[in-house]
Every structure is written in C-alpha cells, then in structure tokens.
Amino acid sequence: MKLPRSAAGWTVAVFGLLALLVGAVGLIWPEALLRLLGFEVLESRASGDYTRTFLTASSMASFNMGVYYLLASATEWRAFYRFTVGFRLLTFTVFSVIVLVDAAPGRFFGVAAWEALGALATAAGLWWDRRGAGAAAPVSAVSSSVDPAGPASTADAVR
C-alpha cells in the first residue's frame, strides 16, 4: 500500500490504522476494549444480554472503517477526507451528549474527544495542503479540479 502524499492523507491514515487496531482488539479481546472505553466488565452476563454481540459488530465495523480510511489515504481521495470532517464532528457531538446525559461513563468522553481532534487535524491538513498547493502553483493553475497531491492513479477510480 502506498504512503499518503499529503498532510490530510496522513491524518486519515493514522485514524484508519488506529480504527483497524481497535477493531481487531475488540474482536480478539473484547474485555480489554470494554475496559479501554470505560465500561464495566462483568464476570457473567444475564440471559438476553447482547453486549458481546454488539461489541463484536462494533469491532468489525471499526476494523472495516480502518481499512476504508487506509484505502482513502493510499489513493489520496480528498473528497473522502472532506466528508469525514463533518461526520467526525457529528460523532463527537453524539458521543458527548450520551456522556452528558449519563448514558455512557465519563471516560467515554475520550472517544468523543478523539473524534473531534481527528476532525480538526484533518481539516487543518486539508487547509495546509491547499495553502501549500496555492503557494507552489501559478494562480491560473490552481482550481477546484486540481488535486494538490497530483494526478490520480488508475486504481483510484472512485474520484
């Protein structure tokens, strides 16, 4: 897999790698993930308690999302980067609210903060990349259709 070629790409790659790793931990060692997120680990679960099922589904989603983010960073899919900023801020809002209404432990706010910091880092990376591209290229060459990371590879058919 190719390394990212932009600051925004690196922020997306880091998040993707961490999402993949957290997903793998949840699949392999769910109790560790529950502790990491600030949830109590019970010795036994009551009949009808689907915590483990939900955790497996969430971990698989995190693992898959990590793969998507890594693929986006390897192909410099900048539209995806921009899309993630708004949705990660929405995720921050939802996760913060569930902590504030006591539907999640206070430690879960760390997950919300991680989403906000990731969104802001990617937004800053997009700004930095745009700023650098504008300074390096003549004014007539800079437009919304020009990607500062260079031409898309043939593998990047989703652009």
Language-model features: where?
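Short, intrinsically disordered terminal tails adjacent to the first/last structured region
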Residues: 136-159
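Short, Lys/Arg-rich, polar N-terminal cytosolic tail immediately upstream
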Residues: 1-5
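Membrane-water interface at the C-terminal end of transmembrane alpha helices
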Residues: 116-140
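Residue-level micro-sites within transmembrane alpha helices that shape
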Residues: 87, 112-116
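Membrane-helix boundary connector in multi-pass membrane proteins
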Residues: 74, 80-83, 93-112
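Short helix-capping/hinge motifs at transmembrane helix termini and TM-loop junctions
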Residues: 29-30, 38-39, 76, 99-103, ...
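Core segments of alpha-helical transmembrane spans in multipass integral membrane proteins
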Residues: 17-27, 47-73, 85-93
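Membrane-helix boundary elements
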Residues: 6-52
